């Protein structure tokens, strides 16, 4: 069985050198008391004899191995965030059809020869040591002793979760955004609703979820991990995915209530510079996104199709979440390991991947030993 795991990197971004080069007398930007990352040129009027240098993050290694039967052979997408004294982690599992029963199947129904999606839940006090609570919510092969949550009528893929403690309705203080799609199989097991679009669910505790009765909320599909967050400056919820992007590119949508979403807007795509760097047909498979101290920090997943067929991670930033600037001269931030090692194939950063812990910033991501073309990634 292939191995897959949740990993952590510790990150430092800095200016490579200092220079006494006073700017001309202009009105300074008021940044208040917030911290600022020198990840773009937004705060820099001019530079002479200095450069911005992207430092390589230091790996903290594997912190959670996905090896339970219900986690299956493809655990790619995740969400992680701090909630009071704990970190919450939601991650995708999908299992090989030879030994997995679809989560919503009734007793006696046939195994579906497809790849049903499940969503798993874990908790941690420090972001490094994780426990998988026995939630008792979803039956898997006749047992509810597992850490599975249920979000949708069918497959919920790439779940992005937001904690919204200020919602006046306590039943909506956790919000989930995901691609909902029906399982198709030669056995033609009937489903209540044939769906292939973006949906949302709500919860009071982050574990027991209720589907929005008006689903879907965006009439487009998105085969990736999804980013959902609250923008405290624009006072809107923001989602990123591939919905309406036209292939492996990144789209954005906004909502004030997490139900009515704006038309999708293309905001991030590969270009000729990416193609020249390694050849093939580079594409953006997804992008882990965090709003950090006044800026959007993006960790785009570069899929090098027809080249290495692997996925690695770069760094980008934006001041409005729409117009993005690539950092570090497009140098790889999180590289693949050697072929055949646990991170030698594909890397997928979490939704809200940057999490502060003391004087460090953690980057959470999952990794696979096999490239994208391998049919049983894990």
Region locations from a protein language model:
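Carbohydrate-active catalytic/glycan-binding domains of CAZyme proteins
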Residues: 21-378
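Bacterial N-terminal signal peptides
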Residues: 6-16
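Positively charged n-region of N-terminal signal peptides that target proteins for export
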Residues: 1-5
